[in-house]
Amino acid sequence: MSMTKTETVHSSAEALRYPWEQHPGEDQVVEVATGVLWLRLKLPFRLNHVNIYLLADGDNWVAVDSGFGNEESIAAWTRLLDGPLKHVKISRLIVTHSHPDHVGLAGWIVERFACPLVMSQVEYLQSVYHQNRGTEERRNAQRLFFRRHGMDETLTDKLLGRGQEYLQRVSVLPASYRRISHGDEIQIGSRRFKVITGGGHALDQVMLYCAADKLFLSADQVLSKISPSVSVWAVEPELARRISGVAGEPHHHPAL
């Protein structure tokens, strides 16, 4: 297990640059700026990883996102906390949005470190909604939605059969949280971050921007080599009409 330190690269070029040729390996942590650690956890999908950031906060650290809620991610966190992060104490967990690869281990981390969960209200309540949506009434509404959009019975049944996967990918959420909202400012160590929220990929996704250091944690709102997924769900079917014709530090792919 090792911690790799690299120098921050600044450039006036307009094109995106990727100063770190290698992403953190398994059980490794990379310091991408003073007091900013980057670690990467595996995902069981085609998009096979999620980036987690730790921000220095005095003698403690603030974690930004938690990873996928499965045994493999717990094992990876445990190895890191026994290795390069063995002296790390997480004082706050900021979760950017309600998708399982970001909120999945929130309950586990909050319990382990007795730290508060920090989210936007919409994203916290969206997580609660997903954990309680497996009722027959909701399944029937989803079935009707899928059929209206041309899916046959076989594919509809297959998709509905995945309905409980959210529960399998997310540890039990803490019963309370600390709310942050667009425009808030939060102090983390010597840095002051402005909270920016955005819709599209998620309803009210949290991003953090430190103007003094030109440091931006973009979550999944801005990705480096792919476009964020913007989906239309049964709970808000008219969204497809509203977005029709619109052109259109990331938490997937290399750090910018």
What does each model-found stretch correspond to?
Residues 1-28, 132-160, 165-166, 184, ...:
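Accessory terminal helices/loops
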Residues 10, 32-39, 163-169, 189-191:
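Short Pro/Gly-enriched beta-strand edge/turn motifs at strand-loop
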Residues 23-24, 47-49, 172-174, 180, ...:
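Residues that act as N-cap/strand-start positions at coil-to-secondary-structure junctions
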Residues 28-88, 208-221:
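Conserved beta-strand hairpin/beta-sheet module of binuclear metal-dependent hydrolase folds
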Residues 44-46, 98-100, 199-201:
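Short beta->alpha connector loops
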Residues 50-51, 129-133, 229-230:
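Short aromatic-enriched loop/helix-cap "lid" or pocket-rim segments at secondary-structure transitions
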Residues 61-71, 169-177, 185-187, 192-256:
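Metallo-beta-lactamase
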Residues 72, 78, 82-186, 214, ...:
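Active-site HxH/HxHxD metal-binding segment of metal-dependent hydrolases
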